[in-house]
Every structure is written in C-alpha cells, then in structure tokens.
UniProtKB/Swiss-Prot annotation:
Terminal protein domain (TP) is hepadnavirus-specific. Spacer domain is highly variable and separates the TP and RT domains. Polymerase/reverse-transcriptase domain (RT) and ribonuclease H domain (RH) are similar to retrovirus reverse transcriptase/RNase H. Residues 241-263 are annotated as: Disordered. This is Protein P. It catalyses: DNA(n) + a 2'-deoxyribonucleoside 5'-triphosphate = DNA(n+1) + diphosphate; Endonucleolytic cleavage to 5'-phosphomonoester. Mg(2+) binds at D418, D540, D541. It comes from Hepatitis B virus genotype D (isolate France/alpha1/1989) (HBV-D). Multifunctional enzyme that converts the viral RNA genome into dsDNA in viral cytoplasmic capsids. This enzyme displays a DNA polymerase activity that can copy either DNA or RNA templates, and a ribonuclease H (RNase H) activity that cleaves the RNA strand of RNA-DNA heteroduplexes in a partially processive 3'- to 5'-endonucleasic mode. Neo-synthesized pregenomic RNA (pgRNA) are encapsidated together with the P protein, and reverse-transcribed inside the nucleocapsid. Pfam families: DNA_pol_viral_C, DNA_pol_viral_N, RVT_1. HAMAP family: HBV_DPOL (MF_04073).
Length: 832
C-alpha cells in the first residue's frame, strides 16, 4: 500500500502526536528509511518510458519556442535629459559633511565608469539590428532606429562621425576631450569642450576639413595624402565636378575619405531657412556651391567623365523612373524636402580609434509583461560574457531574506521612489566607446540582405539599375504606413549610423554592479543626513521609512530635492506610499516579519492547480517550478529540503513524476505560509554539541546527555543535538560549534531529516562557540561531572554585507547647523 499523505506527515514529525524526539528524529537519518520512502513516493524512478510533458500551466519546457510578439504601435519611451553632476562628491559633502571612505570610493567608481574588456570582436553593420521579427522586418528596423535616435538625442549615446571623432547631445563632462584640429584647438569654451560653431563662422572651412577626417598634423592620413593639395573653394558649381565619395555601404571599407561627409554635400537649396545649423556644409550647399577636392587619385571610385550620382540612396529615387506601382520613388516624391542626410550633435569630441562596425546587436521587446504599450531596447553585448576572453564581472552584495527582514521589519511608514532610466544616469568614459557599439547599415543594405540571397558587392547598390532591386510591394506598404508615423525622418533613418554608449548600457555585466554601488552610496549619504529615518536601496529601487506619515512626507520632500540637485531623475508618477507594509524585492515586509507578495502566492496556487500527477514532467519545466517555489520556500515548514527531489532530477536532466502524496505534501506546505520574523539581539544560554556516538546539552545550569543507537556522521549528529536543544529548552538562540548547522542550510542532510529539522529549528538564531569553550563539549562525550563556567555570548542579528551603519564623522564647524524639521522623536532614532 503506497504511503499516504497523513502517514508521511506523521513520519516527518509535523503532527503533534509524534513520540519523544530523541527516539523519533535519529530514525529519519537512516539511509534505508530514506530510500524506502523515496521509492514509495516514486521519487527515485527517473527513467520513464512514457513521453515527457513539456508544458505545465504557463511554464514551458524543452523543445518549445515562444514566438516573440511584435507590436507595430509601440511607443518609444521618452528619456529626460539626464545629466548626473560631475562634482557629485562635493555636493554630497555640502549636504552631509565629509563622506566616509566607502561612499567616496563608490562614487569615484562611477565618475566616470570605465570598461576594459580583454578582447572585442567587431561584427559587420548588417548585424546591428537583429532580424528578431521576420514578419515585421522594416517596421522593426524603423522603430529600433527611432529608439536609438531618441537615446542619442537624450545624451545616452555618442554618434561616430569619423574614426577618431564623435558627436553627442546634452551637457559635456570634463573627461570628454575636445576635438583638436592639428595642434590648435578651436572654439574652446570654458568647459574645455568644443561646441558646434555657428554656421557663418570663420571656422567653417576648418570644421569641414576635420569632418573629412583631415587631421593631418596628427598623422592620421599623412600616408594617404602624399602631398595632394586639398582646397575648399566656394566658386564651383556642383555639376562641374562630382565630389569624391559614396555613402559608406556598411561593408567596412572606409578608404573613401570623404564618405562620411558626402551625405551632406547634396542638399536642396530649400533647406536654408529650415536647418540653419544642422549641416556643416550649409554655407556652400545652400548657395548652390560645393566642396571641391582637387587631384583625385586615379583609382578613385568613379572617373571624372561619369555623370554625377547623388550619394544618398533615398534621394536617388527622386530622379529615377518608377519601376512599378510599388516603386519607392512614389514615396520619395511625396515630399520636396526630406531634411538632412545626417544630424550632428551639439558637441564633438576625440575618441580612440573606432571602426565602422558594431560589437552587439539590438532589438525591441515589450517594456515589461504589464506594459505592452511601450517598447524596451534589448542590447546584446553577450560577447563579453562568453568564451575564453570573457570578463569576470565583479560580485556585489544582494541582501538575503533574513538580512532584509532584520533591516526593514519595523513599525515605520514606508514609501518607494522610482529612479527613471537608472542605468542611463551613470556616465562611461569615452575610451569605452569602441567596445560598446550599436548601429545599422542603413535601410538599403538591410532590405537587400534579407530579401535576396545574392551577395551584395561593395557599392553595387550605388548604380541606377540596382537601385530598384529593393522595391517590393511589402516594402512599399510598410514605408507608406511608417511615413504617417515618422514623416521625413524616414530619410534620416534609412542612412547607416554607428553609435557608441556614453552612459552604461544594460546588456553588460558591469552595469548592475555599478548601479548597485551608486545607489547604495547615495542611500548611505541620505541615512547620515537624516539619522532618524531609514533609506535603503537595491539597484534602482529606493525605499524611505519614517516613524509617522507627516515625518515621511517632509523626509520625502527633502530627499527628493537632494536627489534632484545631484541630477538624479525621479519618476513622480511611480512614487508609491505603502503605509506600514513595505513591498520590496517581491516581499511584503511589516512589523511581523516578511511574506511573499500576493501575486507570487497566486502564481503558486495556479501552479499547483495545473500540476499533473503520475506524468513525467520535463526537467526544464521542473526548473521553472523550482524557481517559483524556491522563492517562497523560506516561508514554509520544511523549507528548501522539501524541494530536494526536484533539484536532483534537474541535476541529472531527467523527467520528474509527481506522486499524489508528494504533490499533496508540497501543496499543503505552500498553502500555509509562515512569516520570516526579525531576529532580536540577546544572550545565548543554551549550548549543544555532539560526537558521532552521543549528544550533550547545557541549558543554564542544567546539563543533559544521550547516545545514538548507531554511530552517525558528525554533521548529522550535530544537527540532531541542535534540534534536541531547541525542543527541550524552547530557546531561540543556540550555541553550536558546527559550521554546517550554523549556516542553516539543511539540504545536504538525509532528505527526511532535513525536512523535519527545518521545521524544528525554524526561527532559531545560532551563535558560533569554539569547541574548546563549548560547555556542552563534556556532556556530549559522556562526562557530566566537570562543569565549565557558562559563557555570556551576545547574539547580534546580521544585516549581511549590506552595511548600514556608517558612523557620521564630525561635521566641520564652518557648515551652518542644519535646522531639523519638527521631529516627532525627542531622541535620534536608530533603525532596528
């Protein structure tokens, strides 16, 4: 007869009518019994002949591909003009007095952040935008380009102008080195950064030269020039001689020196009024003149006799005959003025040599499962986390559940702040730009690469007969719809572009580390400025707690103003006031302790409702089930040990079959959740110790000992002794000299013992006692005669590595005394 659920509960000593613990508990360590129970519950039978189940509820397993859903109406989120103040350390010191070593070190780490990969692999521009939605290629291309353009406008990205220069929008930092022209630097501002000169300025020609990549004194192009005379004359009509250079085709050939600027040379005269400062060549093009380059080398892209070809793929359609009803020339002729071929930022800086390549692909997805209206850019820089040259990212402290509860479980009022686009606050050094490149090869190549199997030869699409190869009904219809959304930006977005990150990107393992350092330093400063409140953060989630609601509101105003003064952008719509139960990191934390949030409890109920019995479930599904149940395991009677059979099946990559008893056991475990309570400081007065053959306890002045029927492994014996001490004395602080018991991880013990011990020792705090000083050492060896003096061992609750108490150094006298708002507390209250 199979083991029933009631019998199994009794076996695990979860019922009250169990016999004396000293007899019952050691039986659970018996290997034979564990094996027998595993067979009864069908836990060990991993080799099954029935086909595996690959889907349970929302959990999918092996061989299932979830098709990503493209939303043609995605809104691109707007990014505030985020600029974190460069003198953030000075501002914090004005606010709170001298910073501690830890705070200073952490803030220096991100001002600016640096990124040093060992090896960087460059990919062709075609791989810039991933064909993630094969059905919606063109739509996805333009949405992604628009997202990248938005980020560039918000100062998050640099735009590669030439191999050694980049432009960006927003306020410059001092480490962004101005663009030099030869030895003299031009248009120097007080900040030492080059801003764009006005169009009519005398620096125009110099600026054009530097755009053409001619920094001759730096020897960049000295070898290529070989004494050619380059001059810029404004007296020659563009039809007289075609300027040299075609649009870079994305194939990476940057030998045509003028290629980057050629896109600006042909612009309709209409644009004079509309774009006074967009193009560097405005002065010439608007008056119908162009840059002339003398003495073209004989091997130039085309001979002089050839008729001039406009370098812009998009605008070429204007002069060509429509090839069909769905020819792109119909769309290009919709507008007289399509705007500039390229936009340039407000500032130009020097950058290390950056090739015309990308180092990671991008694509769009839903912002989050609850918000499918807006899109989110996914950047794949996984090359830095893979292979022999992978970068090992720095580790940082993630607060565990007990530490969080010790810190935050109190009778405070709470609110949480939302930092908008938290990653994009932290500036990156320009030296990192060549490693973090995204971009695209332009619409013509993107469409050609995906629509035809033929190889695209370099510059092939520059000729007229190949121009119409890309015309198709699908492309025509897509562009017509997109024209309603983007208007004349279609032209701008159809050009190739290469962008490097100016702020830390999300797809690199360094970023979460830096963000965690940054927010923890800021919270540390806030805690010291307001000693009677609690500020805590994990990544971009910042919470504030205070004794009363009025106090919390004034604190909220003060902290918000402080954060805004540092240049940190908060999202006021997402500020949440929680009352006395804080919702943080998936938990609800109140004065009683912590519990999982409601939506997680609902997911668990749903999971058990859909869980099939007596059917082999694919280990990938088990992995997902364990992920969900593991989060709530600390709140159950038996904790993680109850999930051990599932862990074993995942490790051996076999299917797992839930027997009705095991499912009922887990179901009952997860339907009654117990809060994880805050640990309290106290004195340890109960000690336990064991040898393989016996155990001993000391409770105050009372001492006990006992023996095991058969010798046990030492860790098992120590665990049993701790369980006896807890059940005999009822004390919730125990002294032990065994590090495994101290760690409270009971997953390596025999399965039944681990489950039972977890319930007996739930809520117990352990203090380490060296063996030589442990008063229970003698009783465990069978000697009751000698009594050692009782130790007074204090227990301090741990807050893990999330150190809170940075003691405030004395504030220098020249700072005025801060006026405290009427505090409901007479004494400065310290967090628990």
């Amino acid at each position: 007869m199979p083991l029933s659920y009631q019998h199994f509960r009794r076996l695990l000593l979860l019922d009250d009518e169990a016999g004396p613990l000293e007899e019952e508990l050691p039986r659970l360590a018996d290997e034979g019994l564990n094996r027998h129970v595993a067979e009864e519950l069908n836990l060990g039978n991993l080799n099954v002949s029935i086909p595996w189940t690959h889907k349970v509820g929302n959990f999918t397993g092996l061989y299932s591909s979830t098709v990503p859903v493209f939303n043609p109406h995605w809104k691109t989120p707007s990014f505030p003009n985020i600029h974190l103040h460069q003198d953030i350390i000075k501002k914090c010191e004005q606010f709170v007095g001298p910073l501690t070593v830890n705070e200073k070190r952490r803030l220096q780490l991100i001002m600016p952040a640096r990124f040093y990969p060992k090896v960087t692999k460059y990919l062709p521009l075609d791989k810039g935008i991933k064909p993630y939605y094969p059905e919606h290629l063109v739509n996805h291309y333009f949405q992604t380009r628009h997202y990248l353009h938005t980020l560039w406008k918000a100062g998050v990205l640099y735009k590669r102008e030439t191999t050694h220069s980049a432009s960006f929008c927003g306020s410059p930092y001092s480490w962004e080195q101005e663009l030099q022209h030869g030895a003299e630097s031009f248009h120097q501002q007080s900040s030492g950064i080059l801003s764009r000169p006005p169009v009519g300025s005398s620096l125009q020609s110099k600026h054009c030269k530097s755009r053409l990549g001619l920094q001759s004194q730096q020897g960049l192009l000295a070898r290529r020039q070989q004494g050619r005379s380059w001059s810029i004359r404004a007296g020659i009509h563009p039809t007289a001689r075609r300027p040299f250079g075609v649009e870079p085709s994305g194939s990476g050939h940057t030998t045509n020196l003028a290629s980057k600027s050629a896109s600006c040379l042909h612009q309709s005269p209409v644009r004079k009024a509309t774009y006074p400062s967009v193009s560097t060549f405005e002065k010439h093009s608007s008056s119908g003149h162009a840059v002339e380059l003398h003495n073209l080398p004989p091997n130039s892209a085309r001979s002089q006799s050839e008729r001039p070809v406009s370098p812009c793929w998009w605008l070429q359609f204007r002069n060509s005959k429509p090839c069909s009803d769905y020819c792109l020339s119909h769309i290009v002729n919709l507008l007289e003025d399509w705007g500039p071929c390229a936009e340039h930022g407000e500032h130009h800086i020097r950058i290390p040599r950056t090739p015309a390549r990308v180092t990671g692909g991008v694509f769009l997805v839903d912002k989050n499962p609850h918000n499918t209206e807006e899109s989110r850019l996914v950047v794949d820089f996984s090359q830095f986390s893979r292979g022999n040259h992978r970068v090992s990212w720095p580790k940082f402290a993630v607060p565990n559940l007990q530490s969080l509860t010790n810190l935050l479980s109190s009778n405070l009022s709470w609110l949480s702040l939302d930092v908008s686009a938290a990653f994009y606050h932290l500036p990156l050094h320009p030296a990192a730009m060549p490693h973090l490149l995204v971009g695209s090869s332009g619409l013509s190549r993107y469409v050609a690469r995906l629509s035809s199997d033929s190889r695209i030869f370099n510059h092939q699409h520059g000729t007229m007969q190949n121009l119409h190869d890309s015309c198709s009904r699908n492309l025509y219809v897509s562009l017509l719809l997109l024209y309603q959304t983007f208007g004349r930006k279609l032209h701008l977005y159809s050009h190739p572009i290469i962008l490097g990150f100016r702020k830390i990107p999300m797809g690199v393992g360094l970023s979460p580390f830096l963000l965690a350092q940054f927010t923890s330093a800021i919270c540390s400063v806030v805690r010291r400025a307001f000693p009677h409140c609690l500020a805590f953060s994990y990544m971009d989630d910042v919470v504030l707690g205070a004794k009363t609601v009025h106090h919390l509101e004034s604190l909220f105003t003060a902290v918000t103003n402080f954060l805004l003064s540092l240049g940190i952008h908060l999202n006021p719509n997402k500020t949440k006031r929680w009352g006395y139960s804080l919702h943080f990191m998936g938990y609800v934390i109140g004065c009683y302790g912590s519990l999982p949030q409601d939506h997680i409890i609902q997911k668990i109920k749903e999971c058990f409702r859909k869980l099939p019995v007596n059917r082999p479930i694919d280990w990938k599904v088990c992995q997902r089930i364990v992920g969900l149940l593991g989060f709530a395991a600390p709140f159950t009677q038996c904790g993680y040990p109850a999930l051990m059979p599932l862990y074993a099946c995942i490790q051996s990559k076999q299917a797992f079959t839930f027997s009705p008893t095991y499912k009922a056991f887990l179901c009952k475990q997860y339907l009654n959740l117990y809060p994880v309570a805050r640990q309290r400081p106290g004195l340890c007065q109960v000690f336990a110790d064991a040898t393989p053959t016996g155990w001993g306890l000391v409770m105050g002045h009372q001492r006990m000992r006992g023996t095991f029927q058969a010798p046990l492994p030492i860790h098992t014996a120590e665990l049993l002794a701790a369980c006896f001490a807890r059940s005999r004395s009822g004390a919730n602080i125990l002294g032990t000299d065994n590090s495994v018991v101290l760690s409270r991880k009971y997953t390596s013990f025999p399965w039944l013992l681990g489950c039972a011990a977890n319930w007996i020792l739930r809520g117990t705090s352990f203090v380490y006692v060296p063996s030589a000083l442990n008063p229970a050492d003698d009783p465990s060896r069978g000697r009751l005669g000698l009594s050692r003096p009782l130790l007074r061992l204090p227990f301090r609750p741990t807050t893990g590595r999330t150190s809170l108490y940075a003691d405030s150094p004395s504030v220098p006298s020249h700072l005025p005394d801060r006026v405290h708002f009427a505090s409901p507390l007479h004494v400065a209250w310290r967090p628990p």
